[in-house]
């Protein structure tokens, strides 16, 4: 659990909680589901919810691609750090049948995740825990795979982050991730999907990610920059249906527009990787 005895850390966590807060998230989700012509009382599929619950760059498409790269098996125990509404966890549980533990610091997002797990009938395979990435509430050597999408940008202490991930992975375990990395110039457009202002954004370069993970005992299996591919495959965010991130993300158009502009101008880079514990 977060240790807020450090005043500065407590203030930062409070600011992060505010950034990822969504009042009455369960009511918003249910309203959006019905507006999309779906019945919450009937079992929903993760695919139907894909535009709503994958709060990271590339959405459901990016999650599917990372799933393939990570080579997760049905028998694997998976930890999703910073799981949000647990969209990726449901995808993994639905497609592969594996069990997934989620750690999510936002109480609102945990409530939304629990609702969607129940509506998809996957609440027996997914458990959502309070906590944060630097103090994971699990024993050493607990997981075959740690999964993380667009979370590290909010964490300043990368060494501690990588150390915790290494700690909870079993020998031979894999860390599969997607992150925004620092580009050629400082990020100047705010708010962004992950940060209201510069004080919440802690980007490092691709080389620093590789070096930091290597220093923590990981071996790189894959680390690639997918910025250009992402920009060529997507356009500015639109709202083709009621099921969008805008259901619970305030000022989505502005945040998404700033993120795209930052990518186009090279201020940030979109990267993904799979690293293995020795």
Model-flagged regions — what are they?
Residues 134-145:
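A short acidic, Gly/Pro-enriched loop at the edge of an enzyme's catalytic core
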Residues 180-200:
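Short, glycine-/aromatic-enriched active-site segment of Class I SAM-dependent methyltransferases
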Residues 159-174:
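A short glycine-rich, Lys/Arg-flanked "PGG" loop and its adjoining helix->strand segment in the class I
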Residues 222-278:
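Conserved Class I S-adenosyl-L-methionine
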């Amino acid at each position: 659990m977060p240790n807020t005895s450090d005043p500065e850390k407590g203030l930062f966590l409070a600011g992060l909680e505010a950034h990822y807060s969504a009042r009455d998230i369960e009511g918003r989700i249910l309203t959006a589901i019905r507006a999309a012509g779906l019945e919450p009382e009937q079992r929903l599929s993760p695919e139907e919810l894909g535009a709503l619950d994958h709060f990271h760059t590339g959405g459901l498409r990016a999650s599917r691609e990372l799933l393939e790269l990570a080579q997760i098996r049905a028998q694997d125990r998976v930890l999703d750090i910073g799981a949000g509404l647990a969209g990726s966890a449901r995808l993994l549980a639905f497609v592969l049948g594996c069990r997934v533990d989620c750690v999510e610091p936002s109480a609102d997002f945990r409530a939304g995740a629990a609702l969607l797990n129940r509506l998809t009938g996957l609440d027996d395979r997914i458990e959502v825990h309070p906590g944060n990435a630097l103090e994971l509430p699990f024993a050493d050597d607990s997981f075959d795979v740690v999964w993380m999408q667009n979370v590290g940008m909010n964490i300043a202490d990368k060494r501690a982050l990588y150390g915790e991930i290494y700690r909870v992975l079993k020998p031979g375990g894999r860390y599969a991730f997607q992150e925004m990395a620092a580009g050629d110039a400082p990020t100047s457009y705010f708010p962004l999907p992950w940060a209201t202002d510069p004080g919440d954004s802690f980007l490092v370069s691709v080389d620093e990610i590789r070096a930091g993970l290597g220093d923590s005992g990981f071996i790189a299996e894959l680390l690639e920059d997918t910025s250009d591919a992402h920009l060529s495959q997507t356009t500015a965010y639109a709202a083709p249906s009621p099921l969008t991130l805008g259901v619970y993300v305030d000022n989505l158009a502005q945040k998404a527009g700033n993120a795209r502009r930052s990518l186009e101008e090279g201020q940030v880079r979109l990267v993904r990787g799979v690293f293995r514990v020795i």
